[in-house]
Design a protein with these regions (language model features):
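A catalytic-pocket lid/entrance helix-loop region that shapes and gates access to the active site
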Residues: 12-19, 114, 118-211
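Short alpha-helix in the alpha/beta-hydrolase fold that links the catalytic acid
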Residues: 328, 342-352
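Glycine-rich nucleophile elbow surrounding the catalytic serine of serine-hydrolase chemistry
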Residues: 102-115
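Alpha/beta-hydrolase fold catalytic core
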Residues: 194-341
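Alpha/beta-hydrolase active-site loop
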Residues: 38, 48, 68-89
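Alpha/beta-hydrolase fold nucleophile elbow
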Residues: 93-105
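N-terminal cap/lid subdomain of alpha/beta-hydrolase-fold enzymes
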Residues: 1-69, 351
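Catalytic histidine-centered segment of alpha/beta-hydrolase-like enzymes
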Residues: 369-381
Length: 404
């Protein structure tokens, strides 16, 4: 997708008109963002090919470039690294501390970009910022790992919708998440790894505990062989309460399906809500604030298929970049109610970047009581920008030598 989300809702000097929780309001438009990090950093928003106004163009002979030059994990990283080099050189910013930030798939992108910049462009960074990162290495791992690390998200979303047992519901969210995390790693993951070798007794014990932490019934958990898809969770959590579905990217949002029956929601209520307000805001902003007019459509999402997912070494790339650059630090920002790139999946991914734990003091994790775009909730817009500001200040070298 385009960089529109962070451009006019998070770090930029203008933000779109939404209410305190992030829902659309009319009239559409934008206003000043008093929380922008423009006071500590110059911000460059980049729209990859086929997003925003970025397009492939023909060469002098009228021949279009091949899609494989842009549409793939490694191709994407390679051309964007070249772009960053060109931009930095044109604007004479080689001496400046540099940070790259990526949201969702952008998390995969900047993990790989950190190493590509160092290895191919000889450009060393001070920080990598992951906002609700999507780690595709994790999604392609064995199902027991992915299923287990989703449980704490189930707990968070169920707590928000008051669907947990009272012993949990009466506690604060941050009191109950650590025990859900501990159960997911130390009990649920080993149990799921057993597959058909698990005993009936253990299967029932696990199903009961999963029900306790998720708000789902023990019956449906057993029907799924203990591995409940997130899509089913979004459909089922409130099925017998209000008949509504909950959002994928932000489970605070509610949807209305044609039928209460089924295994997955008809649509993503949070995404329709966001497009409702973001699309008019960015088009209005570009024309009236930036004074740029064109008949080219601003692509909120672009067609980048077929996307080459082969040879995804971005996680190892980030580790290598950190190992070879003592300055480099990482900040992760995740929303507890994000059901697509869950907060605990992000924690787990960071643990796999540095399994030795030797660089753990260079990782910072920040969680927020919102979803994928935590900055849409005004309280978290303030907090998340303050966290960015602190990270930038703390990771600037300030005369310190880059050495171990």
């Amino acid at each position: 997708s385009a960089s529109v989300w962070m451009h006019i809702a998070y770090t930029g000097p203008r933000i779109l008109n939404i209410d305190e929780e992030g829902y659309p309001t009319q009239p559409y438009g934008f206003r000043s963002n008093p929380n922008s990090i423009i006071d500590v950093a110059d911000i460059v928003f980049v729209n990859p090919v086929n997003t925003g106004y970025s397009r492939m163009v023909a060469d002098k002979e009228g021949k279009m470039p091949e899609k494989k030059l842009f549409f793939g994990i490694n191709a994407d990283i390679k051309y964007l690294a070249e772009w960053v080099n060109t931009f930095v050189s044109r604007h004479n910013r080689w001496e400046s501390p540099k940070y790259i930030i990526g949201e969702s798939y952008g998390g995969t992108r900047v993990m790989g970009l950190s190493n590509e910049l160092q290895n191919s462009q000889w450009m060393y960074l001070n920080g990598v910022i992951l906002v609700s990162p999507a780690d595709y290495n994790l999604y392609s791992t064995g199902q027991p790992i992915y299923s287990a690390i989703n449980l704490p998200y189930f707990t968070a979303a169920a707590w928000y919708h008051k669907a947990l047992p009272s012993v949990l519901q009466n506690k604060d969210l941050l009191e109950i998440l650590p025990e859900a995390e501990e159960y997911a790693i130390n009990t649920l993951m080993p149990a799921l790894a057993k597959g058909g070798f698990i005993s009936d007794e253990e299967r029932n014990e696990v199903a009961e505990k999963m029900s306790y932490y998720s708000g789902l019934s023990k019956k449906v958990i057993l029907q799924h062989n203990l591995e409940v898809p997130t899509s089913f969770f979004w459909k089922d959590l409130l099925r017998d309460k209000t008949g509504q579905t909950i959002g994928r990217l932000d489970s605070r949002y509610l949807g209305l399906d044609k039928m209460e029956a089924g295994t997955r929601p008809d649509y993503s209520p949070e995404l329709t809500s966001w497009l409702h307000s973001f699309t008019p805001a960015i088009n209005h902003y570009i024309k009236t604030e930036l004074n740029f007019s064109t008949d080219i459509k601003y692509n909120m999402f672009g067609n980048v298929n077929p996307w080459d997912r082969r040879n995804n070494n971005t996680r190892d790339g980030l580790r290598e970049a950190m190992a070879t650059n003592p300055y480099l630090k990482v900040l992760n920002q995740s929303g507890y109610y994000d059901g697509a790139t869950t907060y605990f999946a992000a924690k787990y991914s960071l643990s796999q970047v540095d399994p030795s734990g030797k660089m753990k003091d260079r990782f910072t994790f920040k969680g927020y009581r919102s979803g994928h775009m935590m900055y849409l909730r005004n309280e978290d817009l303030i907090k998340a920008n303050d966290d960015l500001r602190s990270f930038i200040k703390e990771s600037s070298a300030n005369g310190k030598s880059a050495k171990y």
